[in-house]
Swiss-Prot record:
Gene3D superfamilies: 1.25.40.60, 3.40.50.1910, 3.40.50.2060, Syntaxin Binding Protein 1, Chain A, domain 2 (3.90.830.10). PANTHER family: VESICLE PROTEIN SORTING-ASSOCIATED. This is Sec1 family domain-containing protein 1. InterPro entries: Sec-1-like_dom1, Sec-1-like_dom3a, Sec1-like, Sec1-like_dom2, Sec1-like_sf.
Length: 639
């Protein structure tokens, strides 16, 4: 988890991984050092199950667990009658029908049925009836509710879902024509996942939320669901700790539920840190980045089809030390570090080559023999470090490719200029260039970049621009090729938000330019960064971080003083906005209803670094980049 890691704690990533390994081991705890071959089995999952497993377990890890084959539930599958099958699926009507069909077709030797979320009694009866009809009752070995309906992306970050994410999207929650029944479904979906999250975490939180928002609806429902489960002592999911490592053994965690509407500028912001940039400008999804490799300009014969670009995928995982160290670093630092890693690798590689050539010398002359004995030990250590060296080379190549792809976007779209300008707008610093000039500059950014910038200006302005000014801006945006639908929605949102409360403030300036980057980089660098500003970040809390800080540290602040307070462990649910507990919290989960982003996540990570012994987890109903968010705003603006 973020913050200093205590020996006894297990991150949500570790907990969900342990739960998955136990499930793949037929729901028996998986022992690392157990001797003997694992039992070979097939894994059958739906898309939900696939999305939960893929960021946590590699194909090799699955094979080590005895999974020889992993197949989608709704794909065409041949019978493998002598092998047990582990199912990991959502308990939907469609999935249950297919599962019953598998039983009827007698596809496998035995069936271990694991449901991502709790299965209803009636659906369980459907399976029992199908098993009876197919004479397969004895083959259904186990049926389990796993409560794993969320996706862990980092030790300290999770999202609710990836499939059907439009169901819980910002657009879905903020649609003006949403019916009460539809809203109930959205809220129930979010609450089910949050409930699974707390079951896996093994803790009952104290809940705080803002009033009159979707976050409040989630809080009320989650409080009720936790309360009901705790009351049923025999079946309560919070009595034992399956891992035996109390994450929150001494103190319960705080859950802060915030609504995306408290801050619409951050998700549109151009960013400057590595992970957030990768998510903003590349195709980065469930910890995997997909790059199109340019195949170079080749003269195709006339009339021939143009060559297709190769797609290459890279997994950016916790095992990748470079990624772990630099995902939160400003981009110029990343480029410099890749270059340094490359140089140190080349030096090591040269050493291995040199030693190898010495070993190949004729053993006649004395010089060679004495050198040989000196170097045997060196060579042994060099050869033993060869796998490590090759892994280092793989990571360097990976990050060279990813960072180069990011840099191409920065240079082509002047993203450093946008980032710096937006930071000034958000922190109310004097602007050195008029907004109209930036929008009208044909060389600066795509129409979407310009739209993002203008929306941030519009959202952050204490006073909305006059109609005359607004028309001028709209004309410049239209001339630049922008679609004005997102602005339509933001205008309505701002008018409504103004009635409700004051706009979010973003603190003081957070960047200081350090001169042009070309001075920082070595002349021999892979990264030609001329003209790109070397902007250095200064820690400044974003609205979500500020709200968390107020509630975690029990600070009195007009922004959070009227937040509702729920304690599912209290016998009667009397909502008191005054917390009983006056001591600050050590652990907290911030959950954004309506979608989150890596900028906010990174801001929380940086905030907690200074807090000794405290931990934060960041969660959101979906994680979107600015392009995806603008699309949702655009759809809302067209209504």
């Amino acid at each position: 988890m973020v913050g200093s890691k205590m020996a006894a704690t297990a991150s949500i990533r570790e907990r969900q991984t342990v739960a998955l390994k136990r499930m793949l081991n037929f729901n028996v705890p998986h022992v690392k050092n157990s001797t003997g071959e694992p039992v070979w089995k097939v894994l059958i999952y739906d898309r939900f199950g696939q999305d939960i497993i893929s960021p946590l377990l590699s194909v090799k890890e699955l094979r080590d667990m005895g999974i020889t084959l992993h197949l989608l539930l709704h794909s065409d599958r041949d019978p493998i009658p002598d092998v047990p099958a582990v199912y990991f699926v959502m308990p939907t009507e469609e999935n249950i029908d297919r599962l019953c069909q598998d039983l009827r077709n007698q596809l496998y030797e035995s069936y271990y049925l694991n449901f991502i979320s709790a299965i209803s009694r009636s659906k369980l009866e459907d399976i029992a009836n199908a098993a009876l009809a197919a004479s397969a009752v004895t083959q259904v070995a186990k049926v389990f509710d796993q409560y794993l309906n969320f996706i862990t992306l980092e030790d300290d970050m999770f999202v609710l879902c990836n499939q059907n994410k439009e169901l819980v999207s910002y657009r879905a929650i903020n649609r003006p024509d949403i019916t009460d029944t539809e809203m109930e479904t959205v809220m129930d979906t979010i609450v089910d996942s949050l409930f699974c999250f707390f079951v896996t975490l093994g803790a009952v939180p104290i809940i705080r939320c803002s009033r009159g928002t979707a976050a409040e609806m989630v809080a009320v429902k989650l409080d009720k669901k936790l309360r009901e489960n705790l009351r049923d002592a025999r079946n309560s999911l919070f009595t034992g700790d399956p891992l035996g490592t109390g994450q929150f053994s001494f103190q319960r965690p705080l859950l802060v539920l915030v609504d995306r509407n408290i801050d619409l500028a951050t998700p549109l912001h151009h960013t400057w840190t590595y992970q957030a940039l990768v998510h903003d400008v590349l195709d980065f999804h469930l910890n995997r980045v997909n790059l199109e490799e340019s195949t170079g300009v080749e003269n195709s014969p006339a009339g021939a089809r143009p060559k297709r670009k190769n797609k290459k995928s890279y997994d950016l995982t916790p095992v990748d030390k470079f990624w772990q160290k630099h995902k939160g670093s400003p981009f110029p630092e990343v480029a410099e570090s890749v270059q340094q890693e490359l140089e140190s690798y080349r030096a090591q590689e040269d050493e291995v080559k040199r030693l190898k050539s010495i070993m190949g010398l004729e053993g006649e002359d004395e010089g060679a023999i004495s050198m040989l004995s000196d170097n045997t030990a060196k060579l042994t250590s060099a050869v033993s470090s060869l796998p490590e060296l090759l892994e280092k080379k793989r990571l360097i190549d990976l990050h060279t490719n990813v960072a180069t792809a990011v840099l191409e976007h920065i240079k082509a779209r002047k993203l450093d200029v946008y980032f710096e300008y937006e930071e000034k707008i958000m922190s109310k610093t004097t602007l050195d260039k008029s907004l109209l000039d930036v929008i009208s500059d044909p060389d600066a950014g795509t129409p979407e970049d310009k739209m993002r910038l203008f929306l941030i200006y519009y959202i952050s302005a204490q006073q909305a621009p006059s109609e005359v000014d607004l028309e001028q801006y709209k004309k410049a945006l239209t001339d630049a090729g922008c679609n004005l639908s997102p602005l339509q929605y933001i205008k309505q949102w701002k008018a409504f938000a103004k009635m409700a409360s004051t706009p979010a403030s973003y603190g003081n300036t957070t960047t200081k330019p350090m001169g042009l980057l070309s001075r920082v980089m070595n002349t021999g660098s892979q990264f030609v960064m001329e003209g790109v500003k070397n902007l250095v970040l200064k820690q400044q809390n974003l609205p979500v971080t500020r709200i968390l800080d107020n509630l975690m540290e029990m600070k009195s602040n007009p922004e959070t003083d009227d937040y509702r307070y729920f304690d599912p462990k209290m016998l009667r649910s009397n909502d008191s906005s005054v917390p009983r507990n006056k001591s600050p919290f050590q652990e907290a989960i911030v959950f954004v209803v309506g979608g989150g982003n890596y900028i906010e996540y990174q801001n929380l990570v940086d905030y907690i670094k200074a807090k000794q012994g405290k931990h934060i987890l960041y969660g959101c109903s979906e994680i979107f980049n600015a392009t995806q968010f603008i699309k949702q705003l655009s759809q809302l603006g067209q209504k």
